[in-house]
């Protein structure tokens, strides 16, 4: 179940709109599931992120959104470790961080991976504390990434069932 739900989050990320800036003069492009359209150099347009990545790989466009950098990840690690509560991370943070690792230079990949793992560990400890609250504050839950919301719901439900089973005279 968890794996399937994580795949849905990845799909949502790929189907999210993003802005691209064409780097070529007029070209007719036909993308799967869409009508043919014309791209013109410098004229921004919105496409699905998955398509934007393919167009960028071909050199036809540059993606308009800013990618995460090593500096971003390092500062988020520092902030996360210095705050008692979860910090607000950029939307789809984990998927963007993994993309950075995939595109990274060998010398920096290990540093990004270590910082990302530390962010995950710190946030997981904070998330587990939330699971034990009767009701977590809405403003804190809003700071969870989609993958973390999934884990929070799963753990909360598992704990609820476990407690119910323990307290039931017939085991459920």
Question: Residue ranges of each PLM-predicted region?
Answer:
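Generic alpha-helical propensity signal that fires on short helical segments
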Residues: 13, 36-40, 57, 63-65, ...
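Compact, well-ordered interaction domains used in eukaryotic information-processing assemblies
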Residues: 26-69
